[in-house]
Amino acid sequence: MEQNSRALIDGFNRKIDYLRMSVTDRCDFRCVYCMAEDMQFLPRQQILSLEELFQVAERFVALGTRKIRLTGGEPLVRQGIVDLCGRIAALPGLRELCLTSNGSQLGRLAQPLFDAGVTRLNISLDSLDADRFKQLTRTGDLAQVIAGIDAARQAGFRRTKLNCVVLKGRNDHELVDLVRFAIERELDITFIEEMPLGVISEHERGESFCSSDEVRARLAEQFTLVESTESSMGPARYWRLAEAANTRVGFISPHSHNFCATCNRVRLTVEGRLLLCLGNEHSVDLKHVLRAHPGNPERLEKAIRDSLHLKPYRHHFEVGGDVQILRFMNMTGG
C-alpha cells in the first residue's frame, strides 16, 4: 500500500506517526516549571504562519501521521486557531487531532473547537487550591480553568485528560483530591514528572522531583489501581481504577521509566524547527524550507525524511545537576 511505502521510519525501526506542533510560544500563564517569570516571547515574524503550520501538518499526514497534537505556549491565545483546527481535522487519513490547553480560554472556545473537529483535549490542572494554583501558574485563575473543564464536557468532548506536573512539597499532597476531581467529572488524569527544560530559578528541580512510583504508591493507599494495556499513542502508561470505570490514571515518567524505546513522535517548534527528541537538540529547520521553497511539498517531504536519521534512541534527562536543554517548554511545545 502507498501508505506503508511512504511511512516515516527512523534509524531504530520505529514508525513515526504522531506529530506535536507548537502553534505559539505565548501564554497567559507563567507556570513555574515551564518558563521564567519575565519570559521574552519571539517576534511574530520568527514564528510559523498558520498557513505554514497547515502545510507541515498536511505533509506529515500524507506521510502516515495519524495523530497530531497542537500545543503552545497556550495554543488558544493564537488568533485563527479554530480555523487552523478545522483545516487540519479535515485532512484525509488523520485519526486524531488533539489539543493541550491550560483551560483558561475553553469557556469561550470549547464548543467552536469541538465543532471544528478537535477530537480530544488535555487540560493542565496542578492544584485544586486557588492560592496554590495562582502560585504555581503565577497568573492563573482556578475558577476560570474549572469552568473551562466543564465547558469542554458540555461541548461534547470525551476522554478529556487532566495533566498534573507533580512537585514535591508544592502539590504532591493533593494527588488523591485531584483523582477524585477527575472521577467526579469522568475525566482521565495523568501525573507527570517534571522535565529539565530551560533554566529556572523559582525552585530546585532535584529537590522538587517526585517519581511516578511514589505517586502511584500514594494513590494505591486510597484506590485500587489495575494496570492497563490501553494507549493514547503517547508516552503515558495507564492504570484503571476499580472504583471508577470512567476514569484512568496515567503516568508520564521521563526520569524513572523513560518511554524512548517505543517513541513514535516528533515535535515542531513554533519557530519551525523539527525536534527529533524532546531531550536532545537534534533538529531540522523546516521554516527555512517552507520559505525558501514556497508551494513545494516535495522539498518539505524530503527535509522531513532526511531528518529521521537524527532521531536518537533515547534522551538522557537527569533529575539533578545542570540543565542539559536550555530551551523552555513553552518554546518546545508542552
Curated annotation (Swiss-Prot):
Residues annotated as binding S-adenosyl-L-methionine: Y33, G73, S124, M195
NCBIfam families reported for this sequence: moaA (TIGR02666)
Pathway: Cofactor biosynthesis; molybdopterin biosynthesis
Gene name per UniProt: moaA
Gene3D superfamilies cross-referenced by the UniProt entry: Aldolase class I (3.20.20.70)
Record's protein name: GTP 3',8-cyclase
Lineage, broadest ranks: Bacteria, Pseudomonadati, Pseudomonadota, Gammaproteobacteria, Pseudomonadales
GO MF annotation: an example: cyclic pyranopterin monophosphate synthase activity
EC number of the protein: 4.1.99.22
Annotated keywords: 4Fe-4S, GTP-binding, Iron, Iron-sulfur, Lyase, Metal-binding, Molybdenum cofactor biosynthesis, Nucleotide-binding, S-adenosyl-L-methionine
Binding site for [4Fe-4S] cluster 2: C260, C263, C277
